[in-house]
C-alpha cells in the first residue's frame, strides 16, 4: 500500500494540532491548568475525535485544549520536539510542520517571537535524536484579524531563515484572503513560498484569490475546486498542489462521508494532490491511516497511491537537490 521505494511525506500537518494526550495531562498539572477530566484515561475523549463524531465546533474545542496547556516557552519547545519524534515514529521521511505562534501564545500571553524561537529550538533538538527531515511553515491566523496577523508575521519573519513557507489559515468566510494581500507581499519579498487554506469553507473564488493575489503555489484542502471546471483546469496546468486531508475533512464536516470526498475527482482531472494528516493529534491518526483510508474508502489502486506519494515529494517546499536526496535515501 505504501511504496517503500518512494519517500513518505506529510506536507499539511499542524504542529499545534498534534499535542500528545499525556503531554496535555502533564503540562496541565505542572502549570495548575484545570483540565476537563480527572484522569489521563478519561482525558482522551475531550482532546481527540472519538468514533464518527463530526462537527467543526467540537473539532476546534479539542484543538483549543492542545494550545491551552502551552503555559511557557519550555512547553512550546517540548511540543515541537515531540512533533519531530511523532513524525519519525510514524515512518515519515519528510514532514512540513506548520504552526501559528499567535494562537499558541494567546492563552498565556507568551511573546510571539519567543514562541517561534521555542518551536525552532524544539525541532532542532528533535532532529538530533530522530532520523527524519523537517521543515517549518509559519501560519497567519486570519480569524484574529489583520492587526494580529501583522504581529504574527513580524514574529515569524524574525526567524525567516528557519522557515520554508507561510500559510493563511482560520476563518475563511469571515476573513477573506484579500484582507491579507499586504501581509503576503511581505512574505513574497522575504523569498518564502506560500500555501493557503482555501476552498474549504468558502467557494472556488477563495482559491483563485489565494493563487492570483496571495501567490499560493499550494492549497490546503481546496475541496470546493471541483465545482469550477476552469479552476480545475488551471490547477492541473500550473501544477498547483492540493494538500488533501480526507479524515480531517470528515471530522470537520467539510465532507459528509469518505464517499463524498473529491480526492478521486482531482486525480482524474490530473491535478497534483497528496495525502496529509492535518491535525493528527486531534484526529488520532497518522499518515499510514490516511493511506489505508485512500485505498479502502477512496478506492485508490496501489499504483495511484504510489503516484500520490510521488506527488507529495514534487509538491514539497524543497530544492531539487533535497528532493533527489530523499529519493536516494530510499535506495
Swiss-Prot record:
Marked site: Important for catalytic activity: 221
Free-text cofactor note: Binds 1 zinc ion per subunit.
UniProt KW keywords: Hydrolase, Metal-binding, Nucleotide metabolism, Zinc
GO molecular function, one term: adenosine deaminase activity
UniProt-listed Enzyme Commission number(s): 3.5.4.4
This protein's record includes keyword Hydrolase: yes
Gene Ontology biological-process annotations: adenosine catabolic process; hypoxanthine salvage; inosine biosynthetic process; nucleotide metabolic process; purine ribonucleoside monophosphate biosynthetic process
Entry cofactors: Zn(2+)
Amino acids binding Zn(2+): 12, 14, 197, 278
Reactions catalysed according to its record: adenosine + H2O + H(+) = inosine + NH4(+); 2'-deoxyadenosine + H2O + H(+) = 2'-deoxyinosine + NH4(+)
InterPro entries with a match to the protein in the record: A_deaminase, A_deaminase_dom, Ado/ade_deaminase, Metal_Hydrolase
Record-linked SUPFAM superfamilies: Metallo-dependent hydrolases
Annotated residues for binding of substrate: 14, 16, 170, 279
Active-site residue numbers: 200
GO terms for cellular component: cytosol
Family statement drawn from the similarity comment of this UniProt entry: Belongs to the metallo-dependent hydrolases superfamily. Adenosine and AMP deaminases family. Adenosine deaminase subfamily.
Function noted in UniProt: Catalyzes the hydrolytic deamination of adenosine and 2-deoxyadenosine.
Listed name of the protein: Adenosine deaminase
Organism: Shewanella baltica (strain OS195)
Amino acid at each position: 500500500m505504501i511504496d517503500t521505494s518512494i519517500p513518505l511525506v506529510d506536507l499539511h500537518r499542524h504542529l499545534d494540532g498534534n499535542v500528545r494526550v499525556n503531554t496535555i495531562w502533564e503540562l496541565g498539572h505542572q502549570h495548575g491548568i484545570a483540565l476537563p477530566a480527572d484522569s489521563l484515561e478519561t482525558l482522551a475523549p475531550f482532546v481527540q475525535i472519538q468514533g464518527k463524531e463530526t462537527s467543526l465546533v467540537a473539532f476546534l474545542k479539542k484543538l483549543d485544549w492542545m494550545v491551552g496547556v502551552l503555559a511557557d516557552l519550555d512547553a512550546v519547545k517540548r511540543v515541537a520536539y515531540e512533533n519531530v519524534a511523532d513524525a519519525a515514529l510514524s515512518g515519515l521521511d519528510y514532514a512540513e510542520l506548520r504552526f501559528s505562534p499567535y494562537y499558541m501564545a494567546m492563552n498565556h500571553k507568551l511573546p510571539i517571537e519567543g514562541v517561534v524561537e521555542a518551536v525552532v529550538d524544539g525541532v532542532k533538538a528533535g532532529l538530533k535524536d530522530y532520523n527524519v527531515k523537517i521543515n517549518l511553515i509559519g501560519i497567519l491566523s486570519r480569524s484574529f484579524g489583520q492587526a494580529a496577523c501583522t504581529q504574527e508575521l513580524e514574529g515569524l519573519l524574525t526567524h525567516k531563515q528557519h522557515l520554508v513557507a507561510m500559510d493563511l489559515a482560520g476563518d475563511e468566510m469571515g476573513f477573506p484572503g484579500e484582507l491579507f494581500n499586504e501581509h503576503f507581499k511581505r512574505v513574497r519579498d522575504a523569498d518564502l513560498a506560500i500555501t493557503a487554506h482555501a476552498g474549504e469553507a468558502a467557494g472556488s473564488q477563495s482559491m483563485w484569490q489565494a493563487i492570483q493575489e496571495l501567490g499560493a503555489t499550494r492549497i490546503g484542502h481546496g475541496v470546493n475546486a471541483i465545482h469550477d471546471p476552469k479552476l480545475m483546469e488551471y490547477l492541473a496546468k500550473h501544477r498547483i498542489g492540493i494538500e488533501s486531508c480526507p479524515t480531517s475533512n470528515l471530522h470537520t464536516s467539510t465532507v459528509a462521508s469518505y464517499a463524498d470526498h473529491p480526492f478521486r475527482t482531482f486525480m482524474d482531472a490530473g491535478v497534483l494532490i497528496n495525502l496529509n494528516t492535518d491535525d493528527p493529534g486531534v484526529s488520532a491518526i497518522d499518515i499510514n491511516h490516511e493511506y489505508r483510508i485512500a485505498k479502502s474508502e477512496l478506492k485508490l489502486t496501489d499504483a495511484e497511491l504510489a503516484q500520490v506519494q510521488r506527488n507529495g515529494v514534487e509538491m514539497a517546499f524543497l530544492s531539487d537537490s533535497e528532493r533527489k536526496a530523499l529519493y536516494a535515501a530510499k535506495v
